Amino acid sequence: MAATMAVTTMVTRSKESWSSLQVPAVAFPWKPRGGKTGGLEFPRRAMFASVGLNVCPGVPAGRDPREPDPKVVRAADNCDIAASLAPPFPGSRPPGRRGRGSEEEEAEGRRHEEAAAAGRSEPEEGQGQDRQPAPARLVSGAIAGAVSRTFVAPLETIRTHLMVGSIGVDSMAGVFQWIMQNEGWTGLFRGNAVNVLRVAPSKAIEHFTYDTAKKFLTPKGDEPPKIPIPTPLVAGALAGFASTLCTYPMELIKTRVTIEKDVYDNVAHAFVKILRDEGPSELYRGLTPSLIGVVPYAACNFYAYETLKRLYRRATGRRPGADVGPVATLLIGSAAGAIASSATFPLEVARKQMQVGAVGGRQVYQNVLHAIYCILKKEGAGGLYRGLGPSCIKLMPAAGIAFMCYEACKKILVDKEDEEEEDEAGGGEDDKKKVE
């Protein structure tokens, strides 16, 4: 039959018009060219590919004769090329979809129809359909920062008083007793509102920057390392730099309101008074030592967190990137905060001293090295670690709660596949070797 069709095709070239040929219930993979007579348009490489196309008068009119009978299994030949190059048959399935099951095609068709009816485009494969990672990570970081700082606000107040020596008491119990006698329990939360306003966006920017930098710096598959040092260190440093640069004025105002309660009535009054009396540049006084203190702390904090989490997975036999649970996250985050705080505390002391400035007749420091030198000269090495105990007591739960809240919010707001992919990306080379 295929040979007969080929002969028929060549004979009809001498006809006035190919369209005058009427063959009932037959569809051909070629057509008249541009409406001209005596010419046919054949798909390239398909001149002799009609064998196996099942072109015969017995093919039902409702089905494309180029499509194979599902009951007949045949080997692939040039007919597939002809069918893919030929114009589509009305009502037939598009090329490339013929090998899929009918149920899958119907489901996909319904999905396309629903998307078209709703006026939206289909998401590409691998993309989340209902979750946006960037806003979700920002919200998760903000919630984590607000919750963690509110829980440890009293410890933050006590730590700040001990670091700057504003009330002449050298113990946590003494500072707590003095605050309760002179200010009441509200004194423990003095400056907490501005602290939350500062920490919430700071943590949002910090965690978002860290996740973005870690994902960018982590090699994919068998790629060589992009940087010669651990990725969490660099990503953490970038996160600390970005968050500090954006939120430093709020940090300075919070410190002033906490220490100089007789000078400033509230946050707004402190902001206006600083701008009026000292100028806008005063809002960034101590930025350099702040960056020197915060950037190493963030780098150490994230690196310690990733390292401890990887060691915990290995000790408990969990796969790389697996969830470690809220309790383990709280403990690991607390330990990471203690390690980072101990390593960078002298820089934190110098930063606080420079932020206070000349208020209350205190000494003005030219730079962070000058501050450290003066503290060493006046108080010795112990002066650089004044308040380390309460600092760790405050930072340990703060870091643990922040990491726990952030991971919990990510599970709710961020696509699970995207979260697991980034978790595995931060697992380190040891996890990759273990999987292999």
From Swiss-Prot:
Q: How does it sit in the membrane?
A: Multi-pass membrane protein
Q: Sorted alphabetically, which InterPro entries does this protein's record hold?
A: Mit_carrier, Mitochondrial_sb/sol_carrier, Mt_carrier_dom_sf
The name on file for this protein is: Adenine nucleotide transporter BT1, chloroplastic/amyloplastic/mitochondrial
**Membrane spanning segments where?**
137-158, 193-213, 229-247, 290-310, 327-347, 384-405
Entry keywords, A to Z? Amyloplast, Chloroplast, Membrane, Mitochondrion, Mitochondrion inner membrane, Plastid, Plastid inner membrane, Repeat, Transit peptide, Transmembrane, Transmembrane helix, Transport
Q: Give the residue ranges for region: Disordered.
A: 83-135, 417-436
Q: Could you name the domain of life of the organism this protein comes from?
A: Eukaryota
